[in-house]
Regions:
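Cys/His-coordinated zinc-finger cores
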Residues: 224
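Right-hand nucleic-acid polymerase module
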Residues: 1-218, 228-416
Length: 416
């Protein structure tokens, strides 16, 4: 294909600086090519072979905020592919859905985001840093919608954290099993829980499962939003917290776990404490981004472990990440009490993780399409994230073209 030194591409009018049409009919995408003379230079030409004028649009040179995080996620994904052999993450943002077609590069100008079409996405919230971020962002909006809906009716939302004792030698799979049993008893299984929810008028809840790692090994725990139909003032939740601890302690011991301490086993935030917490982090953020965000020095999230492996190459860290992944793979991260999702979202059904990552933006437009061999060069050089950033930074095509040229040179498909 490269014997004639041309690289077939497809580009949208908007991507080339051409004014958008006002017609309701979709505008046909004009053809253009990226051409090289073999010296390492690449430039776009129109369908007649004339040099394509690239119009500079200052509004399309976007702010850098968030771009570095995107780069970092794709770099981490490259490491995950090496650690989790045989898992779906190996195909994520790497292989194409239709093996006979290239990869489209899409851009949503209003959201300042670029994405790919015809690319596999693993939807693995536990092991893929790229898909986990996409899923978490969507779940965050769902949780915020529920909180806003409830507060608009005069209710309050409290944050409950449930933990159990654990040690560095604890069998993580058994701990997960016993913790899940205790959680089920607390919310569904014992008369004391039913009385507790009735006494304190807890009408709905959203729970999130999270895990960190520290000196005492893996630390799985739950964050739960409790929806009550009244205002919760300063100190007024203390009685509720005491009642909850008594029930939680009983649920743990009956599930084969050690008795949790009153200081560490259960924590309830309400009133000013909760308000300050929400102002700093956002409850919806805490509920959905637990293993994506960076933890404290003494308490690392799974992706902190992955970052450490990326920086040090220490196989002990890779082994630790694998242990975490295979212990919690398939665990549901977010659970809603019956009926809450439909009530807060006006009847909309909850999307699966796969539906979230596969949901392409309806208003995004294709800037250009990557030939199969070009995509192979980009993925071989691990530049999938870099290309999305280049497009988001500059839709005039200068940065994306230069990045593509570099990938082809480094892959031995062009001469420098």
């Amino acid at each position: 294909m490269y014997g004639n030194n041309d690289i077939s591409q497809i580009g949208s009018a908007q991507g080339r600086g051409v004014g958008a049409t006002t017609s309701d009919e979709p505008m046909a995408l004009p053809q253009y090519k990226l051409v090289t003379n073999g010296s390492g230079k690449v430039w776009p030409v129109d369908e007649n072979g004339g040099r394509l004028v690239i119009y500079t649009d200052n509004s399309s040179i976007l702010v850098q905020q968030g771009f570095q995080r995107l780069r970092d996620r794709f770099k981490l994904l490259n490491k995950v592919r090496k650690i989790l052999k045989g898992e779906r993450t190996q195909h994520c943002f790497f292989n194409r859905v239709d093996r006979n077609d290239g990869v489209g590069v899409m851009f949503n100008k209003s959201r300042n985001k670029a994405n790919y079409s015809n690319i596999m996405r693993c939807a693995n919230a536990w092991g893929c840093p790229v898909c986990a971020a996409i899923i978490s962002e969507h779940r965050k909006n769902e949780v915020k919608e529920a909180m806003d809906w409830w507060k608009a009716q005069g209710g309050s939302v409290l944050l409950l954290t449930l933990t159990v004792p654990h040690y560095s030698h604890t069998d993580i799979k058994q701990l997960k099993k016993d913790l899940k049993k205790a959680y089920s008893k607390f919310f569904k299984g014992v008369r004391a829980s039913q009385n507790l929810f009735s006494k304190w008028m807890i009408e709905h809840y959203i729970s999130c499962f999270e895990i960190t790692h520290g000196e005492n090994g893996f630390h799985p725990h739950y964050h739960i939003l409790l929806f009550v139909p009244y205002a919760v003032g300063i100190g007024s939740h203390i009685g509720m917290e005491q009642d909850m601890y008594a029930v939680w302690k009983d649920c743990c011991t009956k599930s084969g776990l050690d008795e949790p301490s009153e200081k560490h086993g259960l924590h309830l935030q309400a009133g000013n404490d909760a308000a300050n917490y929400v102002a700093k982090w956002g409850l919806e953020h805490e509920m959905t981004k637990g293993h994506v965000k960076k933890g404290k020095k003494e308490s690392r999230t799974p992706f902190d472990i992955l970052r450490s492996y990326q920086e040090s190459g220490d196989e002990t860290e890779a082994k630790l990440f694998r242990l975490y992944y295979f212990a919690f793979k398939g665990q549901r991260q977010l659970n809603w009490s019956k009926g809450l999702k439909k009530l807060s979202s006006k009847g909309q059904e909850e999307k699966t993780d796969q539906e979230i990552v596969d949901d392409t933006d309806n208003v995004a437009e294709m800037l250009f399409k990557l030939d199969i061999e070009i995509w192979h060069a980009i993925r071989q050089q691990g530049k999938q994230g870099e290309l999305l950033v280049a497009v988001a930074e500059d839709q005039t095509l200068k940065k994306p073209i230069e990045l593509i040229r570099q990938c082809l040179v480094e892959n031995g498909q062009l001469r420098e």
